[in-house]
A protein has these predicted regions:
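Surface-exposed molecular-recognition determinants
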Residues: 1-191
Length: 191
């Protein structure tokens, strides 16, 4: 099984940043690819080991594995106990993730599965211009994707890094003004 986490940090001082994934990035025909897409704002992005959640973020689970949603409980808008994840099984079951008031959220970001793919849009201003937005993608099984989000969709101010997925371990990187951080556990620890 190939498991790779790709994190893309976008350093953008403007009011709006949009990244779109095409439908073919998310689906293989009518079958959702095994992937977890999580949109996170804030810098750095810390892993909250006490609650098995990704702190300071919220996002969308866009696939299933073995009949159950992958990543349940991985998303929290306050890093403690307010999950905002939802299972998405088809284009007719879209998802919108709002900012529900977590104190550590610097900007509002939403992810929605639509007919032509997923669009993430950051709106509003940063608490400080040194903060970043990161899009995290974890692929479970299948091919080993190093850069799942096409680099052509990323601005010249961005940085992109790929790190191995470490089973049963939190992985973290990125503390600078334009770097992203990511932390995941293996799927057995998510639900």
């Amino acid at each position: 099984m190939a498991l790779v986490a790709t994190a893309i940090g976008i350093y953008d001082q403007s009011a709006t940043t949009t990244i779109t994934l095409s439908r073919s990035d998310v689906f293989d025909g009518a079958t959702p690819k095994a992937a977890i897409v999580t949109a996170v704002s804030g810098n750095p992005h810390a892993y909250n080991t006490s609650s098995d959640r990704l702190a300071y973020g919220y996002g969308a689970v866009v696939s299933r594995n073995g009949g159950r949603a992958m990543g349940c409980g991985i998303v929290a808008n306050d890093g403690v106990n307010s999950g905002a994840s939802r299972e998405v099984t088809s284009d007719s079951n879209p998802i919108t993730i709002p900012n529900t008031g977590g104190t550590n959220i610097e900007a509002l970001m939403s992810g929605q599965l639509v007919a032509d793919g997923i669009t993430f849009t950051k709106t509003g201003s940063w608490r400080s211009t040194s903060n970043t937005v990161a899009i995290h993608v974890v692929l479970l099984g299948g091919d080993d994707f190093d850069a799942w989000i096409p680099s052509s969709l990323i601005t010249s101010q961005s940085v992109q890094k790929s790190i191995p997925f470490l089973p049963n371990a939190a992985t973290y990187f990125g503390t600078g003004s334009n770097t992203g951080g990511v932390a995941f556990k293996d799927d057995s620890g998510l639900c």
